[in-house]
A protein has these predicted regions:
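Conserved, structured C-terminal
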Residues: 421-447, 455-457, 476, 552-749
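Acidic, proline/glycine-enriched N-terminal capping motif
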Residues: 394-537, 542, 670
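Central beta-strand plus flanking loop segment that forms part of the substrate or channel wall
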Residues: 51-56, 92-94, 207, 221-247, ...
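Dinucleotide-binding Rossmann-like beta1-alpha1 core, especially the glycine-rich loop
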Residues: 52-130, 253, 260-265, 269-273, ...
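C-terminal catalytic lobe of FAD-dependent flavoproteins
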Residues: 153, 260, 269, 283-287, ...
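Glycine-rich FAD pyrophosphate-binding loop
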Residues: 27-47
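Flavin-dependent oxidoreductases
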Residues: 21, 180-288, 293-301, 310-318, ...
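Flavin (FAD/FMN) cofactor-binding and adjacent substrate-gating region
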Residues: 76, 88, 97-167, 172-173, ...
Length: 749
């Protein structure tokens, strides 16, 4: 009798650490009727050759949460599942060559402290005491991560698999998945051994995730945005001095990361393991001459140490004993990269009951947390922490393969680079352009990418330093500072215009459209001819998204939301759309100008319009402006008198020329951000996320607990109102000296 399952609640495709961790966490949640499929042996893809480093450090709040959870899980896993595991918690030292790096470390330290981590700053003398072989003469300081270390990736994966099996889940090795078929709300996963009918399916296929992802395209999916990179590290022969020190002290030396030189250096037995992230990096399987093989299980690329020559020499100068012995073994294997270097964890865009847990660059340290997050998505439909940073829906239709390849090369070669607040990375740009892009550039626009859309961050004047190097600072002052001040003052004192392409825009029509929205949002709907801001909550009353609702008729709405929210919010709206109600994405058909400031009405009159400019706040109308048909929304995110001019792309050049001729000064996203913070307006995923409830965010006026309709989170918000909120949104004036507080900075009182 065959033990091959023909039904399951969930089928996971891929038996690396992330897939197995997902199975383990599903089983822990009580979902034991789940199956994992692996085409070869567990760990056969990228997991088996991973270095196994386990930092808690990250500059991303979501990633730090995942890694913190992983390390806690790994510490007790061997005992929990009764499986031996080599896990060495050695601590780690990150080296800083200058003040800028120390500032980055300080920000990460405070984030970690808020999460309960013991990350601390280190002096040069402390580093020398902790790592006696380290050359420190040119260092500014460092960062100590006491929880860092290394783990055996294969043992970790097998321990998770044993735990999952012991709870009743199924692992099918040497069982390649060959395709999927959607039947109603369920899936049939095809394999070499037969078909499995399931409720949900998860793509955890590692560097084969793009190939597996193609199976879902007939059902609304897209090509998984990723590129496979070659990552190389080598192990030295035994080093006598290191062996002697280890035996005398009863421990390994800490893991070392020289982030300014872009490598990690770790003790492996009595030798060293050096792993650089080189600028002259190499992508694989991206050309017809180098196709992805059908099976690359437990295989490596040929050694290519010449690429690493500079990094090897630099590391030998930093830790001279590295050069005392020869190379024992070279590992050169495939690692998948998303365009921003962060994994894809969450709902598969456009496909119901399908999920992704793939494209992990640091899958070992993130694997435990990723399995937890995926299991929460699958079983609860929401996650404990806000995970937008890794949500697959953060990427939309602009991520073609050329873009993915360019960004992967850039991110890999700058793996340890600092992400300064005024710096824009140059690779993969100009994917989506405004109808007046050339005019904005001609006016001095210094551009930034927002969900692929190019928008001006600020406007440079002749003689301003616009070099790449000028943005390599955490300081507020730079060539942009005076220009941003001038732009903000123009909006405050006169009138400014911001070209704002890329607003996500949906048309909702049909019998029942209004009642559908009432059952989705926490507040009420606007009257015909008006608009309002509506909030969508999850089942805990936390902030899922915010959308501007423009009402044209009883059952006709335009829904406008952030550029980055396009696929996320489409999923939120489309997931339970009733019959007879139609949702259409018009994002690419229209563009927007923000005309705002105390003289905005005068500017609009000068442009020539038949609009009624006396209509009040949160009204909308269709009008002719500068001879062009457009929609006028009486609203401004800058907090001043103003209108949003929404028009078809073909009409925008004439409108832009007219508003400039009428005296409006171009301003950019940096000035807008300053103005909206001054007003106290919140930004989605900056200030508002699923880490906070609507009541904690101070949005009570957008919550109608007395309305008859049930909506997600209503019961939770009612309970929170009775019990009292645990956190409160606050606007602070902070004396920050020369530096603005970067996103997710911790402020201590």
């Amino acid at each position: 009798m065959s033990d091959f399952p023909t039904t399951a609640r969930v089928v996971i495709i891929g038996g690396g650490v992330v897939g197995v961790s997902t199975l383990y966490h599903l089983a822990k949640a009580g979902w034991t009727d789940c199956v994992l499929l692996e085409k070869n042996e567990l760990t056969a893809g990228s997991t088996w050759h991973a270095a196994g480093n386990c930092p808690s450090f990250s500059t991303s709040w979501a990633i730090m949460n995942m890694q913190r959870y992983s390390l806690g899980l790994y510490a007790g896993l061997a005992e929990e599942v009764d499986y031996p595991m080599n896990y060495h918690v050695t601590g780690s030292i990150r080296l800083a060559h200058d003040k800028n790096r120390m500032l980055e470390f300080e920000r990460a330290r405070t984030m970690g402290r808020y999460q309960g981590l013991g990350i601390e700053m280190m002096s040069v003398s402390d580093m020398k005491d902790a790592y006696p072989f380290l050359e420190t003469h040119d260092l500014a300081g460092g960062l100590w991560d006491p929880d860092d270390g290394d783990i055996d990736p294969a043992q970790l994966t097998q321990a998770l698999a044993k735990g999952a099996r012991d709870m009743g889940a199924s692992v099918q090795r040497f069982c390649p998945a060959t395709g999927v078929t959607q039947v109603g709300d369920e899936w049939i996963v095809h394999t070499d051994k037969g078909d499995i009918r399931c409720e949900k399916v998860v793509n955890c296929a590692g560097y084969y995730a793009q190939r597996v992802g193609e199976w879902f395209k007939p059902y609304g999916g897209r090509t998984v945005p990723m590129t496979v990179m070659s990552h190389q590290y080598f192990l030295t022969e035994e080093i006598p001095e290191l062996k002697e020190w280890t035996e005398a002290n009863g421990r390994k030396v800490p893991l070392l990361r020289d982030v300014d030189s872009s490598y990690y250096l770790r003790q492996d037995k009595h030798g060293l393991n050096l792993g650089p992230y080189e600028r002259n990096c190499k992508a694989h399987w991206v050309t017809p001459e180098d196709p992805m093989p059908e099976d690359f299980s437990f295989q490596l690329y040929p050694d290519d140490l010449e690429r690493l020559e500079w990094y090897i020499e630099d590391a030998m100068a930093r830790v001279p004993i590295l050069g005392s012995q020869g190379v024992g073994r070279v590992i050169n294997g495939p690692i998948p990269y998303a365009p921003d270097g962060l994994p894809l964890i969450g709902p598969m865009p456009g496909v119901k009951n399908a999920y992704e847990g793939c494209v992990f660059t640091f899958g070992i340290t993130q694997g435990g947390g990723a399995g937890k997050v995926l299991a929460e998505w699958i079983t609860e439909g929401e996650t404990e922490w806000d995970m937008w940073a890794v949500d697959p829906r953060r990427y939309t239709d602009y991520t073609d393969q050329d873009y993915c390849d360019r960004k992967a090369m850039e991110v890999y070669g700058h793996e340890y680079a600092m992400h300064f607040p005024h710096h824009e990375w140059p690779a993969g740009r100009d994917k989506k352009l405004s109808p007046v892009h050339d005019k904005v550039i001609a006016a001095g626009g210094m551009m930034g990418a927002y969900n692929g859309w190019e928008r001006a961050n600020w406007f440079a004047q002749p003689g301003d330093d616009t070099s790449h190097e000028s943005t390599q600072t955490w300081e507020r002052q730079g060539p942009w500072a005076q220009r941003i001040r001038e732009e903000a003052e123009a909006v405050r004192d006169h009138c400014g215009v911001l070209d704002l392409p890329g607003f996500s825009r949906f048309n909702l029509t049909g019998d029942g459209a209004a009642e559908f929205l009432r059952g989705k949002i926490t507040g009420g709907l606007p009257k015909i001819g008006r608009m309002n801001l509506a909030y969508f909550a999850d089942n805990r009353g936390r902030i899922l998204t915010e959308i501007s609702v423009v009402r044209h008729a009883e059952e006709h709405f335009t829904l406008i939301t952030a550029a980055s929210a396009q696929w996320h919010d489409y999923d939120v709206l489309n997931s339970d759309l009733p019959g007879g109600v139609e949702l259409v994405d018009h994002t690419k058909d229209f563009s927007t100008l923000i005309v705002t400031g105390p003289k905005a009405r005068d500017v609009m009159i000068h442009m020539g319009t038949d609009a009624d400019l006396s209509l009040g706040w949160l009204t909308h109308q269709t009008a002719q402006v500068a001879g062009q048909e457009c929609a006028l929304l009486r609203v401004s995110f800058a907090g001043e008198l103003g209108w949003e001019i929404h028009a078809k792309n073909a009409n925008m050049p004439a409108l832009y020329d007219a508003v400039i001729a009428a005296g409006a000064k171009p301003f950019g996203m940096y000035a807008l951000n300053s103005l909206r913070i001054e007003k106290g307006y919140r930004a989605w995923k900056g200030d508002l996320s699923t880490d906070y409830s609507l009541l904690e965010a101070g949005l009570e006026r957008f919550v109608k607990l007395d309305k008859p309709q049930e909506f997600p989170g209503k019961a939770a918000l009612q309970n929170e109102k009775q019990q009292g909120r645990k956190k409160a949104f606050a606007n602070l004036i902070v004396e920050a000296g020369a530096h603005d507080a970067p996103y997710m900075s911790t402020i201590w009182h």
